[in-house]
Amino acid sequence: MIRSLHTSAVRQGRKKWPKPLPGSVTGNEFVKKLELKAPIAPALDNIEVPDSHPLWQFFCKDKKIVRDQRSFDSSTRPWSVAELRRKSFEDLHALWYVCLKERNILLKEERVTTRMHFENQNGGYRSEHDRVGETMVNIRHVLAERYRAFEEVQQVLPEVRAQANAEFDEKYVTADAVYDSELSLELERHLVAYYGFSTDPRANAGVQVDEKIIEAVKYGAKLKYERYSGATDENGNPIANHGFVHQPKRDIFEQYLMFLANDTTEGVAEALSYIKQYRESNPLPVAPWNAIRVLQHLVEEKMGAAAVFEEALKNKKLDLSEQDILENIPAQFLNKLPKE
């Protein structure tokens, strides 16, 4: 809008504070009474660093900025490859981080002496650093050896596993009933050794299901069915005649139920009874392409249920109903239920 130049135009008023002026303008009483103290000169004594501060990891135990090079033991030597081969993975992991921490301390001390223009006198830090570094190189060498050995075993393992399975099959299926308990332990060792999977859900913590685990479940279920399905129940009827003679194990869910069964006639009969109830509910069979995901879910579910059940037994109280136990607890834990 253009201001009019006409003499009769209304003069625009200017906004002014009323009198007296507000306190925010005249001054604040709190500010007037505030007394400024003399500044505190910076000093090292005024700085407190907690012992848990992570930067202390770059210092030695006595928290000196630089250690005396004469304190280094020149008679020490790096760990040899032969010595490290006898160490476990946990020991190698711990030793690696001890060496890494020591190298960081030595590099810090070397850098400090260089800044102080003593670079011609810090050879001790460099030589000690090289000794620690040689140990770390040897650790990597040992780990590389183990990895190459693992890769080579993976190439021949299927053939070795097939041969071991063939030898164990005949022994397991044809043995007398008096060896049931012994065969149960042998089957457990066989599955863990060649497949890395156990019939005890508690031992499968952290297991990632893959094709090898699927094969282990199928193999264990097949052996138990072949050994005990020809037995008879208390009425003299074959336990295999529980409604599915032609399809004993239809999908991975039924195979896992048989895999968890106790190595006894009663255990297999109980698993067959569960499978019969499952089929009578008319579910859709688990597709082969979905077997890994379904089995992973079953393993985690049974592992959690077994942990709850073991805790209940430990505390001598069971808050689970009978139906919950039958649905969630693996068969090998049912015989642990307290009898009245």
Curated annotation (Swiss-Prot):
Entries under PANTHER family matching the protein: LARGE RIBOSOMAL SUBUNIT PROTEIN UL29M, RIBOSOMAL PROTEIN L47, MITOCHONDRIAL-RELATED
GO molecular function: structural constituent of ribosome
Compositional bias per record (Polar residues), positions renumbered to this chain: 1-10
Name by which UniProt lists this protein: Large ribosomal subunit protein uL29m
Region of interest (Disordered), ranges: 1-22
Primary gene name: MRPL4
GO biological process: mitochondrial translation
InterPro entries on file: MRP-L47_sf, Ribosomal_uL29_mit
